[in-house]
Amino acid sequence: MSNNDFLVLKNITKAFGKAVVIDNLDLTIKRGTMVTLLGPSGCGKTTVLRLVAGLENPTSGQIFIDGEDVTKSSIQNRDICIVFQSYALFPHMSIGDNVGYGLKMQGIGKEERAQRVKEALELVDLAGFEDRFVDQISGGQQQRVALARALVLKPKVLLFDEPLSNLDANLRRSMREKIRELQQRLGITSLYVTHDQTEAFAVSDEVIVMNKGKIMQKAPAKELYLRPNSLFLANFMGESSIFDGKLENGVADINGYSVPLKDAAQFNLPDGECLVGIRPEAIYLAAEGSDAQRCEIKSAVYMGQPLGKWLQTGRGKDLLVNCKPEGF
């Protein structure tokens, strides 16, 4: 491990009875970065977070935080905080007491506690909310209180367990921007779990896609989307239309239609049978053109920006294309 490797999981396996849910997983998160675990339901992402937190014990393998082996350490001794989906706030306590609860358990004096609570609430744009109660604030504000409660402890590692799932679309967008801003400003090493790809892309330095207890690919969002390393990733990361083709000298032939692959040489793609994935935004509709494939519109769905249209090629394959709403 290098000095910059802050959170490290080595050869982690987790089994419940005979069911192996995490299969010999290796994971490294650099100091001060945020990494998101993304994947289909049941892929093991939440189990990984629980293992890091100390809420579950691995069947085998080791977990290191800042160079220290914490595999057998309790959650209290890992210097970790978790922001939950459910907020987990105490309704009988004021906002200030909720945020300061962990400090009180650590024996921090009243005066210092009040100052740190004040600073934490200012960080999440809730200055002056100390004396309010949970039922007096909105869901988005409650999630910011939960975030302040974690930040006030200044943990080595901050964990997020699908924290925005209970919020509406606009609140999710503003909260993910706030989470990313604070994580970068404070430099807290963070592990984030979500099923929302947009959310994962927005908050992360790197995204890890999991499936069946294994890491399928770890990369920045742009690389994951544009250069998936498998058919599973191509289908999972956004919409794709997948065609059988044959590659020769950087050009894929799809049933007689030629598609130049500009990255073929860079990645030393061999000639021969291949699968070609085409993103909806890479296709343009036109009445005619020299480089066009004749298609028939099967259906159109208005989604605001953009509009989705399902086309059928002359060879019977379905193709999804995005276009502007005025073309509806």
Curated annotation (Swiss-Prot):
Kindly indicate whether the keyword Ion transport belongs to this entry. Answer: yes
As for membrane topology, the entry says: Peripheral membrane protein
What is the annotated localization of this protein?
Cell inner membrane
One of the GO biological process terms: transmembrane transport
User: Record-annotated residues binding ATP?
Assistant: G39, P40, S41, G42, C43, G44, K45, T46
Q: What is this protein called?
A: Fe(3+) ions import ATP-binding protein FbpC 1
Q: List, alphabetically, the Gene3D superfamilies matched.
A: 2.40.50.100, P-loop containing nucleotide triphosphate hydrolases (3.40.50.300)
Q: Which PANTHER family match?
A: SPERMIDINE/PUTRESCINE IMPORT ATP-BINDING PROTEIN POTA (PTHR42781), SPERMIDINE_PUTRESCINE IMPORT ATP-BINDING PROTEIN POTA (PTHR42781:SF4)
Q: Which organism is it from?
A: Haemophilus influenzae (strain ATCC 51907 / DSM 11121 / KW20 / Rd)
Q: Which PROSITE patterns match?
A: ABC_TRANSPORTER_1 (PS00211), ABC_TRANSPORTER_2 (PS50893), FBPC (PS51242)
Q: Does the keyword Transmembrane helix feature in the UniProt annotation?
A: no
| Quaternary structure note | The complex is composed of two ATP-binding proteins (FbpC), two transmembrane proteins (FbpB) and a solute-binding protein (FbpA).
Q: Note the Pfam families from the entry.
A: ABC_tran, TOBE_2
The entry's function note states:
Part of the ABC transporter complex FbpABC involved in Fe(3+) ions import. Responsible for energy coupling to the transport system.
Catalyses which reaction? Fe(3+)(out) + ATP + H2O = Fe(3+)(in) + ADP + phosphate + H(+)
Q: Which keywords does the record carry?
A: ATP-binding, Cell inner membrane, Cell membrane, Ion transport, Iron, Iron transport, Membrane, Nucleotide-binding, Translocase, Transport
Q: Name one GO molecular function term.
A: ATP hydrolysis activity
Q: Which domain of life is it from?
A: Bacteria
